[in-house]
C-alpha cells in the first residue's frame, strides 16, 4: 500500500478532491491491485477509533444505571456531525433562493425595455454564482458526513468484536450466527449509507417553511393546495412503502426457503450428483422460486408506483397551485415559472428528503439499540487460580451449562399439552424428564504434576464439559477447582487460523527452533510440511481448507504441545487420524515429549487407558471410576460398557432396544402439524427479556430453530423409557460438546458468509456455541491437498530420543508473547481470507448488455415501446409549445389595459378554458403513457431474472466437479443470493429510473434546443464531456468497489474464525493479537472504502461543475439572443434548472446500472460453465413448456435385454488416474484391480492417501482417465446418470436436505408408501420415523437436525436399498457414531446388502474385520491388494495398524477361510431370524 497524497494535499486540492487524480489515472490505464491503494490516516484507524469509543462507553457504563450507546457516540462525533449539517443546510438554502432570481430575470426581461436588459445580465450572473456556491458547499458536506458514518461504523465494528471475544459460553449459546452477521453487516451499513440524509429531518421542515413563505407572496392561500397535494402524496408513498415492506417480509421467508435448499444443494453437490438427484433438486428449487417471484412482482409493482409518483407529481403540483389562482385572479408569466421552480424544490423536500431522513433515523436508532443490548451481555469471567499450585485438584464440583431451565421446560410442557400431536401421545416428549440436571455432579479428583489423566466415558457423559470447567468456560455452581492457570488446549475439532503452518503452531508464543522442530517431529508433520513448496511458510486459507482432516488435527495438537504450560487439556485429538499415525503420535508426543507435563487426555482407546497414570471414567455426569488401570479391572469389571456407552446390546429386550435407539433423538418438534414452517422472516433482537427472551422460550425445544448438535448427559440411563432428552435444552441429560453430526457438515459457507448470511441464515437457528464445537469445512479429504504418503523423510528434529529431551527447559518459566502484529501486512490478508479475485472487466462490456437484452425476446419489444411513448410525449410537448405563443400571447399584443407590459396578464376570459383543458389533457396523457411505459418494463425485467436463475441453476447442477472444485461454496451461493437479489430487486427499478431520467433529460434538451437553437451548440460538448468523464471514472470506481467488496470478506471471515477457535484463543490468551488482526482487516476495508468515497465525490463534483458551465452558457445565450419576451426565457431557464438535478441523477443511475450489471456478468459466467457431458448449457434440459419427468429414463445400448444391469456387481479397474481439478496434481495414478461379485473390499491407507478420492472416482465425480467396467459394461459407453445409478452411496458427509422424510428417501416420487415403509423397516428406521408427527410427511430442517448422525447414515442406507444398487460405497460410515447405531448399521449391511459388492473406507479396525480383501493405497498407487491371510502373514500397513488383540479376532476368519467358500468368508456368526428382528429400530 502507498502513502496517501491526502497527507500533503492543499486546501484547494482537498476542497475539489484533486488529490485522487493519481489513483484515477492509474485505474483508467491498468488494473488496480491492493498495493495501489493508499494508507489510511491515523484518525481513521480502527485502533484509535475503537479506543475512543470504548473509553466513552466505559465512562457511560460507570456513570449510569441505564447506559446509552447514543450518548457515547454523541461525545465522540456530535460536533463534527453538526458542523457538516450546517454547511449542508446553507447549500440547500441556495436552492430556495434560485427561483427568486429566476423570477426577477423574467420580470426584468422585456424587449420593449432595453434598460432592464442589463439587470437581467447581472441577475443571471448572480444565479450562476448561487449554483457555484451550492456546489462548493454541498459536496464537502456530504463527503464529511459519509466520513463520519464510516468512522462510527468502524468504532462499533471493533467494539462488537471485542465484546464477542469476552462473551460467556452461555451467552454465545443464545446468539445465532445470523444475528451476529446481521448486526455487523445490515445494521452498521446504515451509518455508511444514511448519515448524509440524517440532517434532512430538520433541514427539510425549515426549507418547506421558507418555500411556503416565498410562495405565499406569489399565490397567497392557493399555495396550500400544492402543499396539501404533496403531503397527501407523501402519505400515499408511506402507505405504498408499508405495503411494499409487507410483501418483502412475506417474500423474505420464501427467499429463505430457496436459499436454504440451494445452500444444502451446493454444500452437498457431490452427494446430489452421486444420487442422480439433479432434476429433483432443480424442481424443488424452481417451485420455491415460482412462489417467491409472485411476491417479487407485487413488491416491484408497488415500488414502481411509489417511484413513478415522484416523476409525475410535478404536473399536479403546478396544476393545483397555479391554475386555481390563474382562473380566479389571472396570473403573470413570471409567477408561473417562479412557482414551477419553487414546486420542484418543495416536491423534493416533502416526498424524498424528509421521508428518507425519518427512515434513516429510525433504522440508525434501532441499530444502536441492538448494539447497546449486545454490549451489555454477560461476559466470560476468568477464574482466579493459585499460581503456586503445580497439581490439579477438584473438590465436589457441580456445574450447569444453563440456569433457569426448569421454568422454561415447565412452560414448554404446558404449551405442548395444549397442542395435539398426530400420534395422540402428548406425553411422548416429557414422560420421564427431570428438570434442572447438572452436566457434572460431585466431581472430585487430584492429579500430581507430570501425570497423565485419561478421561473416558460414553457419548454425552460430560468429558468436554470437564475440560471447559477447568478452563473457566463453564463456571461451577458448587465446589472448588485448583490449578496454576497456565493452560494449553487442543479441541476435539481442529481449529486452523488463517496464516502459515508455522504461525498456527507457534500461535504468538516466542519462537524456539529446537522446541519447534521437536514438536513437528512428534506430531508426524515433517512429511506433510516437506510436500509444500513453501514448507511451513505455506499460507493456509480459511479453516485450513487446503489440508486434510488429519493434517488439521495434527497442527492443532502441535499448537497445544508447543506452548510451555503447566496443564495440557487434550480433547480427543486423534479423532481424524488413522490407527498407525495415532499410535505413533501417542507414543512419541503424549508419552515421551510431554512426559514431565501434567496432561488430561479425553479418549476411549483401551491402549491409552493402559498407559495413563490415572483414569477418570464419567457416566451420566458423575464419576463412575477414578484410579489406575489395574484398579479399574479389579473394581469395575463392567467398565467397557460404560466406556462404550451401553451394556451388551444383545442382552436387551426388543422393547429396551427400541427405547435406547429412540433416546438418541435430541431434537423434536412441539408442533402438531405435519409440516413445519422453519423460516424466520424477521431477525431477532439481541434484547434479552424474561428468562432468555420470548424467541428463546418458544424455540427452546423446537427442531425448527435450534440446531445445536450436541449430545447430552443422562440422568438415569437404564431405568428411563421413551425419549430421554433434547439437545437444545435437555432436562435430565445435559450438554456434552461432542457433535453427533458428521465432521464435514458445513455450518457456514466457506467464504463470503456475510454477503449471503443475513439473507438465508436468519431463519436457521445456528448458535455460536455450535459453531465453536463443529467444523464448517470438510474434515475428510481436501480437494486441493497434496497427497500424503507413508514414506518417512529425513528428520528435521534433533535425533536424540524424545523421551530423553525436555523441549521446555530451554525457556523461562513462562513463554513470552511474540508480537506478531507488526509482522503482518494488510496485503497478506488476501492470501488468508480473500476469495478468488473475479476476472471481470473494470467496466461492464456492451456484450453483457446485449446478451441481457436478448435473454427474453419480450424485453426488446418493451424497450422499443418505451422509445415510442417517449417520442409521443416529446411531440405533445412541442405541440403545446407551438400553440403557447398563439394562445397565450394573442391578447397581449392588443392589450392596452396593462400599465406595464412586463407584467402583462396572460390569462383572459377567452383563453382560460383552453388552458385548463390543454393542461389537464397533456398531464393525463403523459401520466397514462408513463404508467404504461414503466410497468411492462419492470415486469419483463423480473421475467429476465427468472430465466437467468433457471439457467444458472441448471449450469451448476450439470457442471463437472473438476470445475466446481475450483469454486468456493460461498462464491457459488452468492450468485444465488446476492446477485439474484440484485436482478430481482435493484436492477429493474434502477433501469426504470435511468430510462425515465434519461428520457426526461433528452426531452428537455430537445425542447430547449427547439426554442433556442444556439443552445444546442452548447449541449453537444457538454454531453460529450459527460460521456468521457463517466467512462474515465467507471474504470477506477468499479475496481475500487470490487476491492472494497473483497475487503469485506476478511472482516466477517475473521469473526467466524475467531468464534470457532474462541476457547483456544482464551486458553492461549491471544485475544489482543486477534483484535489487532481484526483491526488490520478493518483498516484494509477502510482504505478501499475511503478511496471509493473520495473518487465518487470527485466525479460528482466534476459533473456538477460541467453543468454549472452549461447553465451559464444557457443563461447568457437566452438573455442575449432572445427578443420575443419573457415567455421563451422563462421556459428555457426553468428547463435548464430542472435539467441540472435530473442529469446528475441520470448519470448516477447509469453508474448504478453499470455496477449492478456486474452481477449479470457473474451470472453469465456461471451459465457458461462446461457441463459433465460436454453439451452446451441450453441443450441438457427440456423446453420450458415440457414438464420434467419424475424418473430419469436413460437408454443403454448394452442393457437392452431382459437382464437388469448391473446384475452381479463385478468391477474391473484399469489404469485409473484421478485429479480434483483439470490442472491439479494427480491424487491417484494408474490404479488397477478387480473385485468379484458380492465381495467386500476394505480400503487402507494413511490420512490423505486417497481412499475417499478413489470412491469419488468410481462415481465419475473427478477428472479421471482410464477405464472402469461393471459386469462388462465400460463407463465410457453409457451416460453418467446410468453409471451412477449402479452405486449405492453412504458418503462421509451425509446429505439430508430440508424436506419431508418421503422426499429425502424418494425425491422423484417413484415408490409407494408401502415400499418406503418396507425399506425403512429393513434398515431400522421405521420406529424412528413413527415417533414424529406426520411420520413420512414430517419436515426435516437444517440438515436433519432432529436426527442423530447414525440415523442419517441409516437414511443413506435406505436410499441405497431403494435404488436397488448392486455396489455399495461406504466412506467412514462409523465416524462419530454411537455404539448402538454402529451395531445396527453392521447388521443392516449384512442383511440388506448380503449379495452386493461392498467397498469400505474405514479407520475403525473392527469394521474392517468383515472384509475379505484389502486395497492398500500408498504414494498415489495401489501398494497391496490381498486377502486377510496374506495381509497378516506379511509385514504390511494393515499388520502394523492392528493390535495383537485385534489379530486374535481375525483367527476365526483365517482358520475358517480354508474350509468355507469365498461367499461366506466375511459372514458373521449366523443369527436366527428372531434375533435379527430384535435388533431393528
From Swiss-Prot:
Residue ranges annotated for the ABC transmembrane type-1 domain, each copy included: 81-365, 859-1155
GO CC terms: apical plasma membrane; chloride channel complex; cytosol; early endosome; early endosome membrane; endoplasmic reticulum membrane; membrane; nucleus
PTM info: N-glycosylated.
Name of this chain's protein: Cystic fibrosis transmembrane conductance regulator
Residues carrying a glycan: 894, 900
GO biological process: bicarbonate transport; cellular response to cAMP; cellular response to forskolin; chloride transmembrane transport; intracellular pH elevation; membrane hyperpolarization; multicellular organismal-level water homeostasis; response to endoplasmic reticulum stress
Keyword field contains tRNA processing: no
PROSITE patterns reported for this sequence: ABC_TM1F, ABC_TRANSPORTER_1, ABC_TRANSPORTER_2
Domain free text: Binds and hydrolyzes ATP via the two cytoplasmic ABC transporter nucleotide-binding domains. The two ATP-binding domains interact with each other, forming a head-to-tail dimer. Normal ATPase activity requires interaction between the two domains. The first ABC transporter nucleotide-binding domain has no ATPase activity by itself. The PDZ-binding motif mediates interactions with GOPC and with the SLC4A7, NHERF1/EBP50 complex.
Region spans: Disordered R region: 653-831
Gene: CFTR
Sequence similarity: Belongs to the ABC transporter superfamily. ABCC family. CFTR transporter (TC 3.A.1.202) subfamily.
Matching SUPFAM superfamilies: ABC transporter transmembrane region, P-loop containing nucleoside triphosphate hydrolases
Biased composition (Acidic residues): 1471-1481
Residues joined by cross-link Glycyl lysine isopeptide (Lys-Gly) (interchain with G-Cter in ubiquitin): 687
Protein localization: Apical cell membrane; Early endosome membrane; Cell membrane; Recycling endosome membrane
Amino acid at each position: 500500500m502507498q502513502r496517501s497524497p491526502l497527507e500533503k494535499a492543499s486546501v484547494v486540492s482537498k476542497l475539489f478532491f484533486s488529490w485522487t487524480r493519481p489513483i484515477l489515472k492509474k485505474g483508467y490505464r491498468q488494473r488496480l491491485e491492493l498495493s495501489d491503494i493508499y494508507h489510511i490516516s491515523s484518525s481513521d484507524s480502527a485502533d484509535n477509533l475503537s479506543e475512543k469509543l470504548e473509553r466513552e462507553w466505559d465512562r457511560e457504563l460507570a456513570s449510569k444505571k441505564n447506559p446509552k450507546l447514543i450518548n457515547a457516540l454523541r461525545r465522540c462525533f456530535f460536533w463534527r456531525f453538526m458542523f457538516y449539517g450546517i454547511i449542508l443546510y446553507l447549500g440547500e438554502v441556495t436552492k430556495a433562493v434560485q427561483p427568486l432570481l429566476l423570477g426577477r430575470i423574467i420580470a426584468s426581461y422585456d424587449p420593449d425595455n432595453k434598460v432592464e436588459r442589463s439587470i437581467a445580465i447581472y441577475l443571471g450572473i448572480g444565479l450562476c454564482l448561487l449554483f457555484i456556491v451550492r456546489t462548493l458547499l454541498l459536496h464537502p458536506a456530504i463527503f464529511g458526513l459519509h466520513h463520519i458514518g464510516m468512522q462510527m461504523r468502524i468504532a462499533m465494528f471493533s467494539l462488537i468484536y471485542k465484546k464477542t471475544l469476552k462473551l460467556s459460553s452461555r451467552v454465545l449459546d443464545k446468539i445465532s450466527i445470523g444475528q451476529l452477521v446481521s448486526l455487523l453487516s445490515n445494521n452498521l451499513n446504515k451509518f455508511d449509507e444514511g448519515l448524509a440524509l440524517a440532517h434532512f429531518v430538520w433541514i427539510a421542515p425549515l426549507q418547506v417553511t421558507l418555500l411556503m413563505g416565498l410562495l405565499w407572496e406569489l399565490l397567497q392561500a392557493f399555495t396550500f393546495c400544492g402543499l396539501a397535494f404533496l403531503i397527501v402524496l407523501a402519505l400515499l408513498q408511506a402507505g405504498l412503502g408499508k405495503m411494499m415492506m409487507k410483501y418483502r417480509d412475506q417474500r423474505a421467508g420464501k427467499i429463505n426457503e430457496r436459499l436454504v435448499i440451494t445452500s444444502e444443494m451446493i454444500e452437498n453437490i457431490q452427494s446430489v450428483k452421486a444420487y442422480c438427484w439433479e432434476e429433483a433438486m432443480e424442481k424443488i428449487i424452481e417451485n420455491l422460486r415460482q412462489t417467491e417471484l409472485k411476491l417479487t412482482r407485487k413488491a416491484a409493482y408497488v415500488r414502481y408506483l411509489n417511484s413513478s409518483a415522484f416523476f409525475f407529481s410535478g404536473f399536479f403540483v403546478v396544476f393545483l397551485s397555479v391554475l386555481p389562482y390563474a382562473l380566479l385572479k389571472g396570473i403573470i408569466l413570471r409567477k408561473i415559472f417562479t412557482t414551477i421552480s419553487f414546486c420542484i424544490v418543495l416536491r423534493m423536500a416533502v416526498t424524498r428528503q424528509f421521508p428518507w431522513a425519518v427512515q434513516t433515523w429510525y433504522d440508525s436508532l434501532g441499530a444502536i439499540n441492538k448494539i447497546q443490548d449486545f454490549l451489555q451481555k454477560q461476559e466470560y469471567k476468568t477464574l482466579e487460580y493459585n499460581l503456586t499450585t503445580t497439581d490439579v485438584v477438584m473438590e465436589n464440583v457441580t456445574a450447569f451449562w444453563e440456569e433457569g431451565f426448569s421454568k422454561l421446560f415447565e412452560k414448554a410442557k404446558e404449551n405442548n399439552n395444549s397442542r395435539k400431536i398426530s400420534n395422540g401421545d402428548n406425553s411422548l416428549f416429557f414422560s420421564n424428564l427431570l428438570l434442572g440436571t447438572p452436566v457434572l455432579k460431585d466431581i472430585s479428583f487430584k492429579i500430581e504434576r507430570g501425570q497423565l489423566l485419561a478421561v473416558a466415558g460414553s457419548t454425552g457423559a460430560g468429558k468436554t464439559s470437564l475440560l471447559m470447567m477447568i478452563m473457566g468456560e463453564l463456571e461451577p455452581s458448587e465446589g472448588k477447582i485448583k490449578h496454576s492457570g497456565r493452560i494449553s488446549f487442543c479441541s476435539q475439532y481442529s481449529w486452523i487460523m488463517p496464516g502459515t503452518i508455522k504461525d498456527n503452531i507457534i500461535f504468538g508464543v516466542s519462537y524456539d527452533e529446537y522446541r519447534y522442530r521437536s514438536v513437528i517431529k512428534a506430531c508426524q508433520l515433517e512429511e506433510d510440511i516437506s510436500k509444500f513448496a513453501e514448507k511451513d511458510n505455506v499460507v493456509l486459507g480459511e479453516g485450513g481448507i487446503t489440508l486434510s482432516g488429519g493434517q488439521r488435527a495434527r497442527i492443532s495438537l502441535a499448537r497445544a504441545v508447543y506452548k510451555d504450560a503447566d496443564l495440557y487439556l487434550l480433547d480427543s485429538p486423534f479423532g481424524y487420524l488413522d490407527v498407525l499415525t495415532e499410535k505413533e503420535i501417542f507414543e512419541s508426543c503424549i508419552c515421551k515429549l510431554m512426559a514431565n507435563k501434567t496432561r488430561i487426555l479425553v479418549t476411549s482407546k483401551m491402549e491409552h487407558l493402559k498407559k495413563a497414570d490415572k483414569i477418570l471414567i464419567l457416566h451420566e455426569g458423575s464419576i463412575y471410576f477414578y484410579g489406575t488401570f489395574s484398579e479399574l479391572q479389579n473394581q469395575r469389571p463392567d467398565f467397557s460398557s460404560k466406556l462404550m456407552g451401553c451394556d451388551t446390546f444383545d442382552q436387551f429386550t426388543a422393547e429396551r432396544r427400541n427405547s435406547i435407539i429412540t433416546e438418541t433423538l435430541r431434537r423434536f418438534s412441539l408442533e402438531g402439524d405435519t409440516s413445519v414452517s422453519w423460516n424466520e422472516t424477521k431477525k431477532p433482537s439481541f434484547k434479552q427479556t424474561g428468562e432468555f427472551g420470548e424467541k428463546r422460550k418458544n424455540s427452546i425445544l423446537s427442531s425448527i430453530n435450534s440446531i445445536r448438535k450436541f449430545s447430552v448427559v443422562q440422568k438415569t440411563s437404564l431405568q428411563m423409557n421413551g425419549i430421554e432428552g433434547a439437545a437444545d435444552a435437555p432436562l435430565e441429560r445435559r450438554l456434552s460438546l461432542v457433535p453427533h453430526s458428521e465432521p464435514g457438515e458445513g455450518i457456514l459457507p466457506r467464504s463470503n458468509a456475510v454477503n449471503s448470511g443475513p439473507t438465508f441464515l436468519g431463519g436457521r437457528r445456528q448458535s455460536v456455541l455450535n459453531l465453536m464445537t463443529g467444523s464448517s469445512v470438510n474434515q475428510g479429504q481436501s480437494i486441493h491437498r497434496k497427497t500424503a504418503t507413508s514414506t518417512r523423510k529425513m528428520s528435521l528434529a534433533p535425533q536424540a530420543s524424545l523421551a530423553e529431551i525436555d523441549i521446555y527447559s530451554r525457556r523461562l518459566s513462562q513463554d513470552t508473547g511474540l508480537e506478531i502484529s507488526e509482522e503482518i501486512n494488510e496485503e497478506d490478508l488476501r492470501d488468508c481470507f480473500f476469495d478468488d479475485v473475479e476476472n471481470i472487466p473494470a467496466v461492464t462490456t456492451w456484450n453483457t448488455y446485449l446478451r441481457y437484452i436478448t435473454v427474453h425476446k419480450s424485453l426488446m419489444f418493451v424497450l422499443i415501446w418505451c422509445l415510442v411513448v417517449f417520442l409521443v410525449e416529446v411531440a405533445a410537448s412541442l405541440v403545446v409549445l407551438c400553440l403557447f405563443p398563439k394562445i397565450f400571447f394573442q391578447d397581449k399584443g392588443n392589450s392596452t389595459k396593462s400599465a406595464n407590459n412586463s407584467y402583462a396578464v396572460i390569462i383572459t376570459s377567452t383563453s382560460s378554458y383552453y388552458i385548463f383543458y390543454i393542461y389537464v389533457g397533456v398531464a393525463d396523457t403523459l401520466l397514462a403513457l408513463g404508467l404504461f411505459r414503466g410497468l411492462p418494463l419492470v415486469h419483463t425485467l423480473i421475467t429476465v431474472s427468472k430465466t437467468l436463475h433457471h439457467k444458472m441453476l441448471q449450469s451448476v447442477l450439470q457442471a463437472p466437479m473438476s470445475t466446481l472444485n475450483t469454486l468456493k461454496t460461498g462464491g457459488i451461493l452468492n450468485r444465488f443470493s446476492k446477485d439474484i437479489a440484485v436482478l430481482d430487486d435493484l436492477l429493474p427499478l434502477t433501469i426504470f429510473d435511468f430510462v425515465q431520467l434519461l428520457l426526461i433529460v433528452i426531452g428537455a434538451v430537445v425542447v430547449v434546443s427547439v426554442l433556442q437553437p444556439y443552445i444546442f451548440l452548447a449541449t453537444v460538448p457538454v454531453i460529450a464531456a459527460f460521456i468521457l468523464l463517466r467512462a474515465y471514472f467507471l474504470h477506477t470506481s468499479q475496481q475500487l468497489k470490487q476491492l472494497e467488496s473483497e475487503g469485506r470478506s476478511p472482516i466477517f471471515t475473521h469473526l467466524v474464525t475467531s468464534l470457532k477457535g474462541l476457547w483456544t484463543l482464551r486458553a492461549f490468551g491471544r485475544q489482543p493479537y486477534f483484535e489487532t488482526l481484526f483491526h488490520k482487516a478493518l483498516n484494509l476495508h477502510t482504505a478501499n472504502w475511503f478511496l471509493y468515497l473520495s473518487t465518487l465525490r470527485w466525479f460528482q463534483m466534476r459533473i456538477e461543475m460541467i453543468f454549472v458551465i452549461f447553465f451559464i452558457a444557457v443563461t447568457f445565450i437566452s438573455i442575449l439572443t432572445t427578443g420575443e419576451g419573457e415567455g421563451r426565457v422563462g421556459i428555457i431557464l426553468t428547463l435548464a434548472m430542472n435539467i441540472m438535478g435530473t442529469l446528475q441523477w441520470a448519470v448516477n443511475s447509469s453508474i448504478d446500472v453499470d455496477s449492478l450489471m456486474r452481477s449479470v456478468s457473474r451470472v453469465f459466467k456461471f451459465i457458461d460453465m462446461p457441463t459433465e457431458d460436454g453439451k452446451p448449457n441450453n441443450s441438457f434440459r427440456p423446453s420450458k413448456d415440457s414438464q420434467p419427468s419424475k424418473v430419469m429414463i436413460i437408454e443403454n445400448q448394452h442393457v437392452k435385454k431382459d437382464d437388469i444391469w448391473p446384475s452381479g456387481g463385478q468391477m474391473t479397474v484399469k489404469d485409473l488416474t484421478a485429479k480434483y481439478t483439470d490442472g491439479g496434481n494427480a491424487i491417484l495414478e494408474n490404479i488397477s484391480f478387480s473385485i468379484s461379485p458380492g465381495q467386500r473390499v476394505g480400503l487402507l491407507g494413511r490420512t490423505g492417501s486417497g481412499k475417499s478420492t478413489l470412491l469419488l472416482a468410481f462415481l465419475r465425480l473427478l477428472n479421471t482417465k482410464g477405464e472402469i467396467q461393471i459386469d462388462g459394461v465400460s463407463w465410457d459407453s453409457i451416460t453418467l446418470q446410468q453409471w451412477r445409478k449402479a452405486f449405492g452411496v453412504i458418503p462421509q458427509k451425509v446429505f439430508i436436505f430440508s424436506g419431508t422424510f418421503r422426499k429425502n428417501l424418494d425425491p422423484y416420487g417413484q415408490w409407494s408408501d408401502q415400499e418406503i415403509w418396507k425399506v425403512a423397516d429393513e434398515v431400522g428406521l421405521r420406529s424412528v420415523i413413527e415417533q414424529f408427527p406426520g411420520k413420512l410427511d414430517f419436515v426435516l430442517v437444517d440438515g436433519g437436525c432432529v436426527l442423530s448422525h447414525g440415523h442419517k447414515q441409516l437414511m443413506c442406507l435406505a436410499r441405497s436399498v431403494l435404488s436397488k444398487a448392486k455396489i455399495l460405497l461406504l466412506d467412514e460410515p462409523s465416524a462419530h457414531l454411537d455404539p448402538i447405531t454402529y451395531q445396527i448399521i453392521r447388521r443392516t449391511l449384512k442383511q440388506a446388502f448380503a449379495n452386493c459388492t461392498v467397498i469400505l473406507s474405514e479407520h475403525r479396525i473392527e469394521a474392517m474385520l468383515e472384509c475379505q480383501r484389502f486395497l492398500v493405497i500408498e504414494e498415489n498407487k495401489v501398494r497391496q491388494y490381498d486377502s486377510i491371510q496374506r495381509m497378516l502373514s506379511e509385514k504390511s500397513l494393515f499388520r502394523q495398524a492392528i493390535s495383537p488383540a485385534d489379530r486374535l479376532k481375525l483367527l476365526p476368519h483365517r482358520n475358517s477361510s480354508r474350509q468355507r467358500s469365498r461367499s461366506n468368508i466375511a459372514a458373521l456368526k449366523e443369527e436366527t431370524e428372531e434375533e435379527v428382528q430384535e435388533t431393528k429400530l
